[in-house]
Structures are given as structure tokens and as C-alpha cells.
Regions:
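Conserved, well-structured core segments
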Residues: 66, 106, 144, 168, ...
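Extracellular, disulfide-bonded carbohydrate-recognition/adhesion ectodomains
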Residues: 1-151
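A structural micro-motif recognizing beta-strand termini
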Residues: 13-15, 218-221, 284
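Short, exposed beta-strand/loop patches in secreted or surface proteins that constitute
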Residues: 1-3, 109, 245, 268-272
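Short boundary segments that mark the start of a structured unit
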Residues: 151-264, 273-280
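Solvent-exposed loop/turn segments flanking beta-strands in beta-repeat/beta-sandwich domains
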Residues: 179-181, 287-293
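Solvent-exposed, low-complexity segments and loops of surface/extracellular structural proteins
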Residues: 263, 282, 290-293
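Short amphipathic, basic-aromatic surface patches that mediate peripheral association
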Residues: 172, 284-288
Length: 293
């Protein structure tokens, strides 16, 4: 299970190698986590310790850790985060801040062998000619922690006349590198599904990089003179996406304006009749009678 802090979603990914863990994090639409302060560091400990710690590993007690987005280019002793930012907050373990050690792929140690809490960063020394892999039996490097910017969705309102078809727009802001499915569901107001419009129940998929989608809405026509009618279309997350969708405006108010002919009829006589002679009028629209007082 993942967790949200601020505008980012965090989750555990697999990866015995730092590069594999990073690739899996990027496949979610983010990267390995960049830790900016002690609040974020402790947030990771609180939420993911139980997922990565191996109980009584090889009889040596509870141990576990996860790759984070800390790395060092081998031709440059400057360490940096995977997003290119410099390191402003650090929480290295003993002797882990030595820039002379050839390495790539920092990890966050989440628990000591004796089961006590641990919140320090450690590095994995490597020969410069090797990949950043480790033995599959190693306890500390089975996972990585991904950090993915959240996507925020909103849906536009719509006003249209009876008999018309128009488009409604769903917009996406924030992180757009993940694939997500958005559910659309209509609910009656004064307008009724079946008689005023076709009920809406569908899924719209956003591919990585897409920021908006439109879908068409059609209002039925009738000959009844009535007030404007309304309904609501709500958007929600599918519940099955790797990254949960967030919403800034999840409700669209649809107003269907009456289009029935409300013009008062006019009459003109085609003939002149003698007073008192009956005249027959033929009218091809429904009439409503009003009883005179």
C-alpha cells in the first residue's frame, strides 16, 4: 500500500539492483524518492518499514532497507538526487558521507538487526566497473521507494438546449506521467435519465502525458413547455490504478434548457361570415384550456 505526503504518492517497488528499482519507479510515472527534510524521512519510516523489513532474516533478527534516489556519478565526486537537485538535507550513517567511496545507489536503513528503529542513509560500495547490483540473498536491498507526483482532475459544467449535443472537458494538472482511468457517472436532478438524456456510466483513460479529455453529452428533445432541467456528472478514480487520482472539482452541473415552442399563436380570418355564423378553427399544436372566472 502507498501513502500520500503533500502532492506526492509514495510506494514500494521491487529491485535487487538500484537501477532496477529506479526503472520500476519510473514506470509508475515518478522516480526513486528524493528526501528533502526530516519530516519526509520519518514519513517513509512510519509508512514503509513493515513492507520492507524481513522478519528474523537468516536467524539474525529483523532487517530491511530500501533504495532511495541518492546517487553519485563515478567521474564526479558530487553526490546528487536523481532529479538533479543538490543534497540539502542529509541523514548519513557512520562514515557514509565520504565522497571518496566509489558507489551508486543510496538506501534507507529502516530497521536494525535487533528490531529497533533506524532512520539513517547508507551506501553500497561498488567496483566502478560493475553494475549496481547486489547478491539476491542480501537482506537490505530487495526494494526501492518510489515518489510519484499526484495528478489532479476537474470537470467542466455544461449548458445546452434540448436536442443538442455538446462536449464536456476533463482536465488534468500536477503529475502527468502516470496512466490513470477516470470513471464518469450521472445522477438525476430535475432531469431524468431515459426521458431527458442517456444515463452516463463510462471510463475515460488518460495515457502518460495527456492533460485533457472530452466526451459528448446529448440532451433529448420534447414538445413540453417546462423550466430548465439539471443533472450532475461525477468523476472518480477507478480504484485499480497504481497511483490514486486526486480531484479539485469532481462534479459537473449539466443544465438542459427548454426548447419547446412558446410563441403565442396568431389567427387571421380567411373569409368574412355573417354575424352569428359558426367558424371552425383548426390548430396543429396541443392546447391547454383556461377557464374564465
Amino acid at each position: 500500500m502507498g501513502a500520500i505526503l503533500g502532492q506526492n504518492y509514495y510506494s514500494v517497488v521491487n529491485g535487487y539492483e538500484w537501477t532496477t528499482a529506479r526503472s520500476n519507479a519510473q514506470n509508475l510515472g515518478g522516480d526513486l524518492v528524493v528526501i528533502n527534510d526530516v519530516t519526509e524521512n520519518n514519513f517513509l519510516l512510519d509508512n514503509f518499514r513493515s513492507e520492507v523489513v524481513i522478519s528474523n532474516f537468516d536467524g539474525a533478527g529483523d532487517r530491511g532497507g530500501a533504495w532511495i534516489g541518492l546517487h553519485q556519478v563515478r567521474t564526479n565526486t558530487d553526490r546528487a538526487w536523481v532529479d538533479g537537485t543538490t543534497i540539502s538535507y542529509t541523514n548519513y550513517g557512520p562514515d557514509q558521507d565520504k565522497a571518496s567511496v566509489p558507489w551508486d545507489g543510496g538506501y534507507l536503513l529502516l530497521m536494525k538487526a535487533d528490531g529497533s528503529n533506524q532512520n539513517t542513509w547508507w551506501i553500497e560500495p561498488q567496483d566502478p566497473l560493475t553494475t549496481y547490483s547486489i547478491n539476491a540473498n542480501q537482506w537490505a536491498y530487495r526494494y526501492g521507494i518510489a515518489e510519484v507526483p499526484l495528478s489532479y482532475y476537474s470537470i467542466s459544467d455544461l449548458t445546452l438546449s434540448e436536442g443538442d449535443t455538446s462536449s464536456i472537458t476533463i482536465s488534468r494538472t500536477g503529475g502527468t506521467n502516470s496512466t490513470q482511468n477516470i470513471l464518469l457517472t450521472s445522477s438525476d436532478g430535475t432531469a431524468s435519465a431515459g426521458s431527458d438524456y442517456t444515463a452516463v456510466s463510462q471510463t475515460i483513460s488518460f495515457a502518460a502525458g495527456e492533460t485533457s479529455k472530452t466526451f459528448n453529452f446529448a440532451a433529448f428533445t420534447d414538445s413540453v413547455t417546462e423550466s430548465d432541467e439539471t443533472l450532475t456528472i461525477t468523476i472518480s478514480g477507478s480504484g485499480s490504478d497504481d497511483i490514486p487520482a486526486q480531484f479539485t472539482d469532481n462534479s459537473s452541473l449539466i443544465t438542459i434548457q427548454n426548447s419547446a415552442d412558446t410563441t403565442s399563436p396568431t389567427f387571421s380570418s380567411a373569409a368574412t361570415n355573417t354575424a352569428g355564423t359558426k367558424v371552425i378553427l383548426t390548430y396543429n399544436e396541443a392546447l391547454s384550456a383556461t377557464t374564465a372566472a
